[in-house]
């Protein structure tokens, strides 16, 4: 059984989607070991407690980043987390944090990376006038929205869209993408070739093409 650690700063809709997928058997051989927020008023923490999950608040305000990260890592390890999922966690992890969980930290971003990294990605995409947007689940590394891409889902930008309607449709795909990515990573049947995330069944073909 794999133990997931969830980090969030807000309502945690992707956390809820992960929890629902576990309960429904769509995520295999996994449980949520702990939910951690850096904000005491995060609605996601209330939701976690209502679901009977271990839920911790480790405030970040006024603390150096690495000091806070060490407290979070200690809590994750105490609860046996072997995969960390960021679900609207509005903190940039320190290199030290990332090194504690190599290829074991996932993030979801509401754009087709590498396009539109950072905050308000949906608004960036809409303002730029792209015809297709979407979401990306990727490994977390030392740079912002940069790690190897695991899963992407596309969403057409309709002529009738506004920023809100586009964001809602992207969020629906986020929930599907995170479940898919977690299953792939927990299965362990993958390799990273350069920057490419490749399922192991495809490795021979990739090596032949190089």
Labelled PLM ranges:
Residues 1-210:
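One-carbon transfer enzymes
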């Amino acid at each position: 059984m794999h133990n997931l650690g969830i980090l969030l700063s807000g309502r945690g809709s992707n956390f809820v989607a992960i929890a629902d997928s576990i309960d429904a058997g769509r995520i295999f051989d996994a449980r949520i070991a702990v939910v951690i927020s850096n904000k005491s008023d995060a609605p996601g923490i209330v939701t976690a407690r209502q679901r009977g999950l271990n839920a911790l608040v480790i405030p970040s305000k006024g603390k150096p980043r690495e000091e806070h990260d060490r407290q979070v890592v200690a809590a994750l390890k105490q609860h046996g987390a072997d995969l960390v999922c960021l679900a609207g966690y509005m903190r940039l992890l320190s290199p030290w944090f990332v090194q504690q969980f190599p290829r074991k930290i996932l993030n979801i971003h509401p754009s087709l990376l590498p396009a539109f990294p950072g905050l308000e990605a949906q608004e960036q995409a809409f303002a730029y006038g792209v015809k297709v947007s979407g979401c990306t689940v990727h490994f977390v590394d030392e740079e912002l929205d940069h790690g190897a891409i695991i899963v992407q889902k596309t969403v057409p930008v309709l002529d009738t869209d506004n920023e809100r309607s586009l964001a809602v449709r992207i969020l629906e795909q986020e929930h599907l993408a995170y479940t898919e990515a977690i299953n792939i990573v927990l299965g362990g049947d993958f390799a990273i070739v350069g920057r490419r995330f490749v399922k192991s069944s495809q490795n021979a073909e990739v090596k032949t093409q190089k």
